[in-house]
A protein has these predicted regions:
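Extracytoplasmic gating/loop element in the C-terminal half of outer-membrane beta-barrel translocons
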Residues: 6, 10, 92-193
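Membrane-embedded beta-strand positions in outer-membrane beta-barrel channels/transporters
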Residues: 73-75, 170-174, 229-231
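Outer-envelope beta-barrel architecture signal
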Residues: 70, 81-83, 164, 188-192, ...
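Repeated loop/turn-to-beta-strand initiation elements of outer-membrane beta-barrel proteins
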Residues: 82-86, 180-181
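Conserved small-residue
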Residues: 1-64, 117-136
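Transmembrane beta-strands of outer-membrane beta-barrel pores
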Residues: 80-82, 91-95, 170, 177, ...
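Membrane-embedded beta-strand positions of outer-membrane beta-barrel proteins
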Residues: 87, 194-196, 232
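Conserved small/polar residues in nucleotide/adenosyl-binding loops
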Residues: 233-239
């Protein structure tokens, strides 16, 4: 959803106010119109007070845009007696994303991050460990359901994630053999350098189960991979 005067990619959704814990809460809930609400389901605030939860009347701005307001990077390079250490950090700030995806005009969609066995996939460990049960009423996540649960699939502040991150994008450590040693060794080489390198080594972010650089939750994005390499660079002596 894009509105005049609002940031491109601003997230709109329902304001979650907790999980249903008592029969009184269920008896006095506003009409949601998607599924049957049970204990452990997400409660939404009736913003306009009409007794119904609707897109036109109750969706509000939640979080920040899905496009970072701030992108930053830091490049470092250290040299000492033939040794070299270089690093590239990059990150983003003032950005949000939701775990429930963006199908159905951004209003609702379960994903592998919000429902176990979604589309025949696996069940995230964190959902199983910290979902609502009668013995775990202070859970971080709503009750589990192996089938579609429309009430818990809505875009809402419940599934909002802080998208800020800092990533060690590239790290390289190497050593260049001094030319006088190569000349003395008389091995026909004028330059020898060996180094090890890695990419995407560390990421500091609030929600560790997603790649914070992904374009969208349910768009088939394959997370960036860690890579390690060890290289030897040589150049022959001039004739």
């Amino acid at each position: 959803r894009t509105n005049i005067g609002e940031p491109l990619g601003q997230i709109y959704g329902y304001k979650a106010i907790g999980l249903y814990q008592t029969q009184e809460q269920l008896d006095n809930r506003p009409f949601v119109g998607n599924g049957v609400q049970r204990f452990g389901d997400i409660m939404y605030e009736d913003i306009n007070g009409d007794g119904k939860i609707t897109q036109d009347g109750d969706r509000v701005k939640i979080g920040h845009s899905t496009l970072p307001e701030l992108n930053y990077s830091l490049s470092m390079d250290f040299n000492w007696k033939g040794f070299n250490l270089s690093a590239l950090w990059q990150g983003a700030a003032i950005v949000s994303y939701t775990l429930n995806g963006t199908y159905s005009h951004g209003s609702m969609d379960n994903t592998v991050y919000t429902r176990p066995f979604y589309s025949g996939g696996n069940a995230p460990y964190y959902l199983v460990e910290d979902s609502w049960t009668p013995e775990n009423v202070n859970a971080r996540y709503p009750r589990l359901s192996a089938i579609h649960n429309g009430n818990n699939a809505y875009t809402s502040s419940w599934w909002l994630v802080n998208g800020n991150f800092l990533r060690l994008k590239n790290l390289q450590f190497g050593y260049t053999i001094p030319k006088k040693i190569l000349a003395k060794a008389n091995i026909g080489l004028s330059n020898v350098r060996v180094y090890v390198a890695g990419t995407n080594l560390f990421t500091f972010t609030e929600f560790k189960y997603c790649d914070p650089e992904m374009a969208i939750i349910n768009n088939g994005y394959y997370p960036q991979q860690k890579n390690y390499s060890c290289l030897l660079y040589t150049s022959p002596s001039p004739r």
